[in-house]
């Protein structure tokens, strides 16, 4: 920093002056591929440093969820993802480590530890109303069979019996269809 408040950056045979300088060296949220060099340099120069936080990063499973959902790696689908008052309607992607894709990466910029992230896997459908209608139209059809018309087959097979009781839709109570 210069005493007058600006900066001079020396580049080989040239000096470039400016009122402000931006130091960027990658994302600290990915320690295996990033560096805190820019932050250390800025602090070393006595500059004010905006506190860093992860952004545009995937969400990772805890051990129990990793075991339950690892086989869904590669499954993607459109979803509405929300946290607090912010929401995005973008694709999400199941990975071997967690959830990624445009929707999850965007909402990560608004998420703080302890916040709840809500994911609507059927954002363009009132799932409850659709299932109630199917109680008359397709009463003998299993819930998992119906859901495979709207969601990836591998996802439905994985969560059947965990998120919902797989039974004939005509036998399901309205309460059991709200999940």
Each model region followed by its residue ranges:
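Glycine-rich loop(s) and the adjacent beta-strand/alpha-helix scaffold that form part
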Residues: 20-66
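Core beta-strand elements of the Rossmann-like FAD/NAD(P) dinucleotide-binding domain
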Residues: 10-20, 87-90
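A conserved short coil-to-beta-strand element within the FAD-binding core of flavoproteins
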Residues: 1-6
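Short, solvent-exposed secondary-structure boundary motifs
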Residues: 8-10, 98
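An anion/pyrophosphate-binding glycine-rich loop and adjacent beta-alpha core
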Residues: 47-51, 57-178
């Amino acid at each position: 920093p210069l005493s007058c408040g600006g900066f001079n950056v020396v580049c080989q045979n040239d000096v470039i002056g400016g009122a402000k300088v931006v130091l960027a060296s990658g994302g600290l949220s990915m320690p295996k591929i990033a560096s805190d060099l820019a932050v250390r340099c800025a602090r070393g120069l006595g500059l004010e440093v905006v506190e860093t936080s992860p952004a545009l990063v995937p969400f990772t499973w805890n051990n129990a969820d990793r075991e339950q959902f690892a086989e869904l790696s590669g499954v993607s689908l459109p979803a509405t993802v929300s946290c607090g008052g912010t929401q995005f309607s973008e694709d999400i992607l199941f990975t071997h480590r967690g959830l990624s894709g445009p929707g999850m990466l965007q909402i990560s910029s608004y998420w703080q530890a302890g916040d709840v992230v809500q994911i609507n896997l059927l954002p363009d459908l009132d799932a409850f109303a659709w299932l109630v209608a199917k109680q008359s139209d397709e009463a003998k059809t299993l819930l998992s069979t119906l859901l495979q018309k709207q969601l990836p087959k591998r996802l439905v097979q994985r969560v059947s019996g965990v998120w919902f009781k797989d039974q004939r839709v005509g036998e399901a109570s309205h309460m059991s269809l709200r999940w």
